[in-house]
Amino acid sequence: MNKVKCYVLFTALLSSLYAHGAPQTITELCSEYRNTQIYTINDKILSYTESMAGKREMVIITFKSGETFQVEVPGSQHIDSQKKAIERMKDTLRITYLTETKIDKLCVWNNKTPNSIAAISMKN
């Protein structure tokens, strides 16, 4: 009987930790990183530029408001686990631009110029 109570208590504690451990919104996700801030965009991407030129390999997006953001194209400065995520973000932005999907919010690192995208939230 005591074993069952301990198991139930442990399961309840573990479940509550797991439920609160993963961020549920872009705001919660962004708060986990230093040098980040949330930009509320609520607009379509006005321009999409992809550069493969040497040290400036990146995707740059701009909005009507004039806000400009970047995603670096994976290079030698990135570890393998980062490269796939960066490629996915680049692909997501390209598709978002081509389908004219609205970007709701961006979480960006504000210690780079232009600000570098860490996370994206979209809506139709």
Curated annotation (Swiss-Prot):
<feature type="disulfide bond">
    <location>
        <begin position="30"/>
        <end position="107"/>
    </location>
</feature>
<dbReference type="GO" id="GO:0031640">
    <property type="term" value="P:killing of cells of another organism"/>
</dbReference>
<feature type="signal peptide">
    <location>
        <begin position="1"/>
        <end position="21"/>
    </location>
</feature>
<dbReference type="InterPro" id="IPR008992">
    <property type="entry name" value="Enterotoxin"/>
</dbReference>
<keyword id="KW-1015">Disulfide bond</keyword>
<keyword id="KW-0732">Signal</keyword>
<keyword id="KW-0800">Toxin</keyword>
<comment type="subunit">
    <text>Heterohexamer of one A chain and of five B chains.</text>
</comment>
<dbReference type="Pfam" id="PF01376">
    <property type="entry name" value="Enterotoxin_b"/>
</dbReference>
<keyword id="KW-0260">Enterotoxin</keyword>
<keyword id="KW-0843">Virulence</keyword>
<protein>
    <recommendedName>
        <fullName>Heat-labile enterotoxin B chain</fullName>
    </recommendedName>
</protein>
<dbReference type="InterPro" id="IPR001835">
    <property type="entry name" value="Enterotoxin_B"/>
</dbReference>
<dbReference type="GO" id="GO:0005576">
    <property type="term" value="C:extracellular region"/>
</dbReference>
<dbReference type="GO" id="GO:0090729">
    <property type="term" value="F:toxin activity"/>
</dbReference>
<comment type="function">
    <text>The biological activity of the toxin is produced by the A chain, which activates intracellular adenyl cyclase.</text>
</comment>
